[in-house]
Each structure stands twice: as C-alpha cells, then as structure tokens.
Amino acid sequence: MGILDIVPTGVITGDNVLKLFTYAREHGFAIPAINVTSSSTAIAALEAAREARSPIILQTSNGGAHFFAGKESSNEGQKASIAGSIAAAHYIRSIAPFFGVPVVMHSDHCAKKLLPWMDGMFEADEAYFKIHGEPLFSSHMLDLSEEPKKENIAQVKEYCKRAVPMKIWIEMEIGITGGEEDGVDNSHVSHTELYTQPEDIWDVYRELSSVTPYFSIAAAFGNVHGVYKPGNVKLQPALLGQHQAYVKEQLKTTNDKPVFFVFHGGSGSSVNEFRTGIKCGVVKVNIDTDTQFAYVEGVRDYVLKYKDYLMTPVGNPEGADKPNKKKFDPRVWIHEGEKTMTKRVLTALEDFYTVNTL
C-alpha cells in the first residue's frame, strides 16, 4: 500500500493531511516543506515530487507571500502578504493535480506582530470553505515562540478552535529556533535557549489535543535558520525521542510516537541529523535557504556561460548582427534555476526517505 491508496493527488486538506502525516510517521519518512515565492519556485518543487513519486509541502512565508503579490506593493496592514498567500494557494491548487502528487499547502512562520496576515488567510479559508466544503489552505504555522509559554499555548489554542470546524492543520513552535526567518529574528539568543523541555511538549500536547487532532509541534533542539558552517550548530534531534517518551508516559498509551514533530532550520543539517529526527517522529522538514541557493546556482552558471550573449539584444561572439533572443528569453534562464532547485529538492526527498512512497 502507498500514499495514493489513502489520499488523493492535488492539494489535500483535513483528514487527508492527518492520514498523510500518520502514514509518514508509521513508515519512517518525512516530507520536505519547500518555501515558494513564485510560480517558478513552486514548479521546481513539484517537478521533484513528480519525479520522485513523493508527496510535497509547499509553503509561503510572510515575505515570500509579499513578493508573490509584487515586491513594490505596499504591505500596510499585511494586505500584500495576505493577497500573495491567497494567490499562491489558488495557483498551486490549480496546477498541483497536473503533477499527480499529494500537496500540502502551508503558510510558514507567523509571529505575533504578523497575526493580521494569519487572520486574512483564515478569512480566505472560511470563504472558500463555504463554497467548497474545505479550506483554501491545508495548514498554517503560528510561531509565538518569542512570547511567554502560557501566552503562546493559549493563543495557538484559540486559533485551533477557529481552525477545527474546517479541519485546518495547525503547526506551532515551542522553544526558540535561532537565526532569522521572515518576521522572526532570534539571532541574538544564547545556545542554551535553543532546547525545548519534555514538560513543554506535554503542556502543548495536553492543551491542543483537547481541541483538535490536527496539529504538529516544532520543538527546539538547537535549530538555527539560515546559513551556517557545519559544526557551528549543536543539533540534538535525539531529544525528540525523549519528548515522545515523556508524552507517551503521560498519556499511558502504547503509541511510541504520539506527537507529530516538525524539523525547522533544515538547511545545512546533516543527513544523519534529519534521519535521527525522523526516527523520533519528525514528519515535516523545512527547507528554504538551501533551495534559494540552488535556484541561483542555475541562473548564475547560465549567465556566466552566456554573458557575451546577454549584453545586447543583437550582437555576440558569432557576429555583430546575430540576435540573442534565444539566450535572454526569461523562459530559458529561469528554467535553469528551476532545474538546479529541482535537483536540490530531489536530494531532500532522498535524505528523508520520501522517494517512491506514493
């Protein structure tokens, strides 16, 4: 049995998201969550999923959503980020079935100061639900980790109450992920603050599970967003196993992995770190920085190779009257970026044991 025996292709929601994550947890793999900022980056990720016969998660950050709506657009009141996220969701919904893979449409890190963005997406979900019987987005991520724990959990719980009638999946963060990500800057925190305690996980699980089964937890185990040299970050994904054991004991259950965990700050981490996390119940891994660099690699190499064909519309080493349109056509050099990004997503799918799970 594979994933397509239990969920459909295209954007999935509600119980199908729960089925997908449960299947991943039971079969020992995780699904890459790729940040997309355009139709081009979305296609690059979808191409990888199709080639690997794997599910995929596509997510828009606040800044990525703003870019989707036009970088020069005013984002007063988060209106551009709201519009960009909605546009991305509609686009991905329309194109995803063509690729023949299940897709989770997700919104990434929403800090407290960005909650108007979240509210705008929820309004779009509710409007879409009235017509189609399902939300526009599959899931949303609330990052209130900068707030006191009690406030963090209470506010996430309120959003869960709003989400549960539509069966929207909610991802939350407890503990601090270092570095900087759209709207959340934790680059100043000490390493000792980057580790969540088992009691924290239980507090979250106890409160949210009283409202909804559709939630996952991004626990901190030394994670850092962005670019860093190997060895500079002390990741301890095995801590997630201790968290699972603690929650199992509190629940008095036979399920060794009752919690759906998320691995943040995945760019630059080792394959062993990923796979240790997966063994401990990680079902989603965020990848952004690595795919950004992979995209620019293809464009960079193309520009360097054909630089003499990109200076003027006409005239190149082959002759002063030779046209260059076939070289500067955006469809050509943008596709070079897509190809190298697709290759990087394929690597993630292999690292996370996601290949051929359909």
Swiss-Prot record:
Where in the sequence is Phosphothreonine found?
T289, T312, T340, T342
The record's annotation in Gene3D superfamilies points to:
Aldolase class I (3.20.20.70)
Q: Where does dihydroxyacetone phosphate bind?
A: G226, G265, G266, S267, N286, I287, D288, T289
Q: Which SUPFAM superfamilies match?
A: Aldolase
As recorded in UniProt, its EC number(s) are 4.1.2.13
What pathway is it annotated to? Carbohydrate degradation; glycolysis; D-glyceraldehyde 3-phosphate and glycerone phosphate from D-glucose: step 4/4
For the keyword Metal-binding, the answer is: yes
Query: Which cofactors are named for this entry?
Result: Zn(2+)
A Gene Ontology cellular component where this protein is annotated is: cytosol
Alphabetically sorted, this entry's keywords are:
Glycolysis, Lyase, Metal-binding, Phosphoprotein, Zinc
UniProt: Zn(2+) 1 binding residues: H109, H225, H264
Q: Which domain of life is it from?
A: Eukaryota
Q: Where is the active site?
A: D108
Cofactor: record remark: Binds 2 Zn(2+) ions per subunit. One is catalytic and the other provides a structural contribution.
**Which PANTHER family did the record assign?**
FRUCTOSE-BISPHOSPHATE ALDOLASE, FRUCTOSE-BISPHOSPHATE ALDOLASE CLASS 2
Function text? Catalyzes the aldol condensation of dihydroxyacetone phosphate (DHAP or glycerone-phosphate) with glyceraldehyde 3-phosphate (G3P) to form fructose 1,6-bisphosphate (FBP) in gluconeogenesis and the reverse reaction in glycolysis.
What's this protein's name?
Fructose-bisphosphate aldolase
Please report the organism this UniProt entry assigns to the protein: Schizosaccharomyces pombe (strain 972 / ATCC 24843) (Fission yeast)
Question: Source organism lineage?
Answer: Eukaryota, Fungi, Dikarya, Ascomycota, Taphrinomycotina
Name of the gene this protein is made from: fba1
